[in-house]
Amino acid sequence: ISGMSGRKASGSSPTSPINANKVENEDAFLEEVAEEKPHVKPYFTKTILDMDVVEGSAARFDCKVEGYPDPEVMWFKDDNPVKESRHFQIDYDEEGNCSLTISEVCGDDDAKYTCKAVNSLGEATCTAELLVETMGKEGEGEGEGEEDEEEEEE
C-alpha cells in the first residue's frame, strides 16, 4: 500500500507545474483585458452646486467623476488644499461619487470650494460657493438634528 501511494504522489507531481502555468496565463489574460479599456481624461458627470447653509449646521458638496485610469480627487477651499479632519470629511467611492462634508459650519467656511480630479491624461475641476448665514443672536441655530432634514427628501 505504501508503494502505491508513493507512485500516486510521484505521478501527480508533473501536473502541478502545468496547473501553475495555467493560472499564470489566466492572470495575464485578465491583465490584457483590463488594459484594453480606453484611457480617458477625467470629466465630471455631476458637478458641485452653490449652497446656502445656516451656521452650526452641516454642508455637503456632491459630484461624480469619470476617467481611466481612475482619477485622484482633491478638494480645495479658496485654492488651498482641504485636509480631512473632524470638520472636513472626504468620501470617494469606486463608482466615482465624491463628496466633501463640512460639519458644524462656521463663518470661516464661507468660501469657494473646488473638486479637482487628475489622472495621467489630464484634469478636470468643478467649483461652487458655500454661503454661511450667521444668526443674529448668539446660541440660536445651534440645535442638533437640524442638519439632515432637507437632504432626506432625495
From Swiss-Prot:
Disulphide connectivity of cysteines: none
Pfam families: I-set
Biased composition regions of type Acidic residues, renumbered to the chain: 141-154
SUPFAM superfamilies: Immunoglobulin
Region annotation (Disordered) ranges: 1-24, 134-154
GO cellular component term, pick one: stress fiber
Keywords: Calmodulin-binding, Immunoglobulin domain
InterPro entries (alphabetical): Ig-like_dom, Ig-like_dom_sf, Ig-like_fold, Ig_I-set, Ig_sub, Ig_sub2
PROSITE patterns (alphabetical): IG_LIKE
MF term (GO), any: calmodulin binding
Composition bias type Polar residues, residue spans: 10-19
Domain Ig-like C2-type: 42-133
GO biological process: tonic smooth muscle contraction
Record text on subunit structure and interactions: Binds calmodulin.
Family: Belongs to the protein kinase superfamily. CAMK Ser/Thr protein kinase family.
Function text: Corresponds to the C-terminus of smooth muscle myosin light chain kinase.
Protein name: Telokin
Organism of provenance: Meleagris gallopavo
